[in-house]
From Swiss-Prot:
Name of this chain's protein: Exocyst complex component 3-like protein 4
Species this chain originates from: Mus musculus
Gene Ontology BP terms: exocytosis
Domain of life: Eukaryota
UniProt record similarity statement: Belongs to the SEC6 family.
Length: 721
């Protein structure tokens, strides 16, 4: 749109206030100050217009932006917006002053590139520029980063231009005001761009130009004092330039550039492994640490003469940049390992008091916001636990496969600290402890969740392992003892390390322990069972048939020496009870019945066997002394010559073993071969004793006769009759 022209065609109209002198910017070679006004050929006349000025401002700003890369493009847009508002206002003032719009006046275009507005437009004489010509131009001062001197000159020119505008010097030629105002605006923008360049170079270069930083801080302070209040709407002269905000923006941009360049060659999402992401985060931490140390130790002292919050501003800028980078990495994180590396770095590396390498440089927790938003943190933890559940299940599968490989390879038996040892307990304990400890390093909530995941997986693994082992060909005293030890160790170690948190593990581990112990007993029982058949026979009276049986017991006890003591003692007592029970069962179910001298010999033989059994098990460490009286009591009844004392022996037997039944008494009396009347009296007497014994028997009382089956024979029936 063409600019309104004043006056009729003819000579250029002079300013009505010619004595007022004005000064323009000197000739300069600075790029942002070089701007050639476009000539618009239309009908043989040159018409400066708003469109021409917009194009000129755009090209000049573009050249400046290419000279100073990565500066805020909004800076020039804001300045141009103020400029054209002011230009409109100047035009309106010219119209209201009584200068109607008329035909265009041919005017020789002014060259803004030389920094000097033509004197015909303002009435300024050439000698007024001599003080400026003797010194450096504003552009040169900016280029040389003499920002204070450059600002003082710009401030002087700005004050003069405001005075000229107030005195309506530009009433008849508002474009002259626009040219000078545009030149001022571009130089102010150039200073702002130079401030951004100084900030960027301070962080990216190896050294620190403290003089430039001090100059920057001083010129920002001077600008804030000079431009304290905003002007009327549409007037951009003498308005605050907000260079402090521009400095803060430059700090943020430089921090973002530094953080984004860290680990740029690493592609963490290329695979599910954690090594690439860990390398990237290590590089990121190193960059942040180096830059913040540089800020604190080298850059902050340069600002010490001003009130610039250097450390706080850079700290917030880097914190925000790191948070943004982590959010980007979180979107691409894959698998359990990468998620954990990300969470661990945020919680333990970046949040560590010695992250910056010195206690006095520790990152404060306040007033910085969380590095990761709570919602994002919760999502990462949820994703991590989902992957973790699958991973832990897979780890238990691998442990089972390793044990199966050992069974097939029949590896050498291992004894650790005197006990049979299988790697099972160590593998499981390390698996649980490692993941729980790693999760605890991130948060207490994640630790509790991980512990529950491990407990559930272990509860499912133990029965699977038990079933797989018992179905294999590796079942033996050594493996059974080793796995009993493993279950006991897991119970004690896990429950001791994580008390009250994984009680559900108690049930499957106890069940597996009992199962392995049961199969261990079955092995020795099956091995000894045939040796009981020769007891209470004719050959038994004259031969030492008990020794092979005791040899089996001693051999088995050697295995129990390598089983954890509580279970070893319990198993040994079970073997002791098994021997006494099977011995009595063989006596009460005899293949042959003795009378006379053979019965007495049998009684003596039973006494000797009872003593040998008791001595053997006591020598092995059995604490089941309550079993010693069983065989002796039956032997005394069979060998008692004074029949009235049989009643006393029966009373002792019933009191010692309250689980004895009436059919057991009948079987014993049948072996003794007493008369009918005496048998009836003894049965009548023992009936009351048996009833009282059953009534007073405790649930925890030992069991012996209850497990001995006595078939009804002719002799027993005769005894009953």
């Amino acid at each position: 749109m063409p600019l309104p022209q004043t006056g009729a065609p003819g000579p250029e109209v002079k300013s009505p206030r010619e004595p007022r002198k004005s000064q323009t910017l000197p000739v300069t070679t600075w790029k942002s100050n070089s701007m050639k006004e476009q000539s618009v050929h239309h009908g043989g006349s040159l018409r400066p217009s708003l469109g021409m000025l917009k194009q000129t401002l755009f090209r000049t700003s573009l050249r400046t932006s290419t000279h100073k890369p990565k500066e805020d493009p909004g800076l020039f847009r804001r300045s141009s917006r103020f400029l054209f508002r002011s230009l409109r206002r100047a035009i309106d003032e010219g119209l209201t002053a009584g200068h109607p719009q008329g035909p265009a006046v041919p005017e020789k275009p002014s060259k803004v590139t030389d920094g000097v507005s033509r004197q015909a437009a303002t009435g300024t004489e050439a000698e007024d520029l001599e003080p400026q010509a003797e010194s450096k131009s504003v552009a040169d001062l900016i280029t040389e980063r003499q920002l204070v001197k450059a600002f003082e000159q710009l401030r002087y020119l700005e004050t003069q231009l405001v005075a000229d505008k107030t005195s309506r010097t530009f009433t008849q030629d508002p474009t002259a005001y626009a040219r000078r105002a545009m030149d001022l605006c571009l130089h102010y923008d150039g200073m702002a761009a130079e401030i951004g360049a100084i900030v960027r170079e301070a962080l990216s270069s190896e050294g620190v130009d403290r003089d430039a930083l001090a100059e920057l801080a001083q010129v920002v302070h001077l600008e804030e004092e000079a431009h304290q209040t905003s002007q009327a709407e549409g007037d951009f002269l003498s308005t605050p330039r907000h260079w402090r905000m521009h400095w803060e923006d430059a700090v943020r941009l430089s921090a973002q550039e530094s953080v984004q360049q860290a680990g740029a060659k690493v592609i963490p999402g290329a695979a599910e492994g954690s090594s690439d992401l860990a390398q990237l985060l290590a590089e990121l931490g190193g960059v942040v640490r180096h830059d913040l140390q540089k800020v604190r130790l080298e850059m902050q002292p340069a600002y010490e003469a001003t009130d610039f919050p250097v450390w706080e501003t850079y700290l917030r800028a880097f914190h925000s940049a790191v948070a943004q980078r982590l959010q980007e990495l979180a979107r691409d994180a894959r698998g359990c390992e990468q998620l954990y590396v990300l969470l661990d770095w945020a919680a333990n590396v970046y949040g560590s008091p010695d992250f910056l390498g010195a206690p006095d440089l520790a990152l404060p927790t306040e007033p910085l916001p969380p590095l990761l938003e709570p919602a994002l943190w919760a999502r990462l933890e949820s994703d991590y636990t989902s992957f973790l559940e699958t991973k832990i299940t897979s780890c238990f599968d691998s442990i089972l496969q390793l044990e199966q490989n050992r069974w097939e390879a029949d590896e050498d038996r291992e004894v650790l600290q005197g006990l049979y040892h299988a790697p099972l307990s160590i593998d499981v304990h390390m698996l649980v402890a490692e993941h729980v400890k790693a999760a605890g390093a991130i948060s207490a909530e994640l630790e509790a969740t991980t512990l529950q995941i491990c407990a559930r997986a272990l509860c499912l693994f133990v029965p699977r392992f038990e079933k797989a082992f018992l179905a294999s060909k590796a079942v033996s005293e050594w493996y059974l003892g080793a796995y009993i030890n493993a279950c006991v160790e897991l119970r004690t170690s896990l429950l001791a390390r994580f008390p009250g948190t994984i009680k559900e593990l108690e049930k499957p581990l106890v069940a597996a322990t009992n199962s392995f112990q049961k199969h261990l007993l079955q092995i020795v029982q099956q091995d000894m069972q045939p040796l009981f058949k020769v007891l209470y026979t004719k050959s038994w009276l004259t031969q030492d048939t008990l020794r092979p049986l005791m040899d089996k017991v001693v051999d088995f006890a050697h295995h129990l020496e390598h089983v954890t003591p509580p279970l070893a003692q319990e198993t040994l007592q079970e073997v002791h009870r098994f021997v006494v029970r099977e011995y009595l069962g063989q006596v009460l179910r005899p293949h042959e019945r003795f009378s006379g001298q053979d019965r007495l010999k049998g009684s003596n033989k039973m006494n000797l066997d009872a003593q040998a059994i008791s001595n053997t098990f006591q020598g092995l460490g059995s604490e089941a002394k309550w079993l010693d009286q069983a065989i002796l009591s039956v032997a005394e009844i069979l060998g008692e010559t004074y029949k009235d004392d049989i009643r006393r022996h029966l009373e002792t037997l019933i009191r010692s073993y309250p689980d004895i039944r009436r059919d057991h008494i009948l079987a014993i009396l049948a072996l003794r071969r007493l008369g009918r009347r005496r048998n009836q009296n003894l049965l009548q007497h023992t009936q009351d004793l048996l009833r009282a014994a059953h009534e007073t028997r405790l649930p925890s009382h030992h069991v012996l006769f209850e497990e001995i089956e006595v078939p009804t024979s002719v002799d027993v029936l005769i005894t009953c009759i």
